[in-house]
């Protein structure tokens, strides 16, 4: 419920607007992001000649210009602070209240991204509830006591795409929509190449049925992340993380859950090629690091060459020294690809690619529109379609 009470004051010859805000909502965000009001004040006063004070942010009434600056930090929309409905930091409201430690040290942008998808998920759940439709719960439930390799092979029929595409992006799209058949939301977000702060995560699983993916220059990396997060989903183990293959190769410490999900993802994607891959005895300079066979497996399974070499190191079939040489070469190839993409985007004006939209998300919005819960403008905006193209979703 929004009161939208406001006053106008004259300051330094200018008329400024003050608005009544719900301080409880600022407290909620500070709790969510593990910040204090002093932390908030420090961020607000960065690069400012005249700083704000605690009294400026603690009052019932707040300068609208200050409120907009606060929202530049949290990015939830100004209307959020003008809403006086009750809100409290409960475990049911956010993964940040259910977990205190994550697989990565999350930066502010990573937290903002995850929170935005949590807010979206709450909307989608409300659409189904208002439509009086219950979404079936996932039928598969695994534990880390289950063998990850055997488990991956068993669930492939449910979650692996039927029509295997050759191109990595097409495969990723089919993979996302295969999960949609099991009522799992997959949301992909795309960051612009020239953005000031980038989210330092690759993916996240937020229970009970939402996976978030960061668009990567390498779709193979994104595919592996999706398979990894599917493992979290089947274990019912929430996580927000960046996947670090070199650290795995170096024997970096992993939790039992992370190791299980990595093994699950690798086996899930390799499928019947796994036994053939296991026949590789060693990879070093005497056999050109098995480049031809690695290229073959990577092309056939959508598993990156780096992930395949990482597995060889973990299986003691490749030395860490040889791995670092190969990795340096792969990193150089990857960087050249990124530089070429940036150069191309600069020539085209910097247009960003669009995220893949899950069929489950489309179905949710179609249901909401059909039942009068959202309007046509909202439908077209979310799916990025023109009004005269809406009929395609209801054919």
Where are the regions a protein language model picked out?
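Active-site hotspot residues in diverse enzymes, especially metal/ion-binding acidic/histidine motifs
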Residues: 2-395
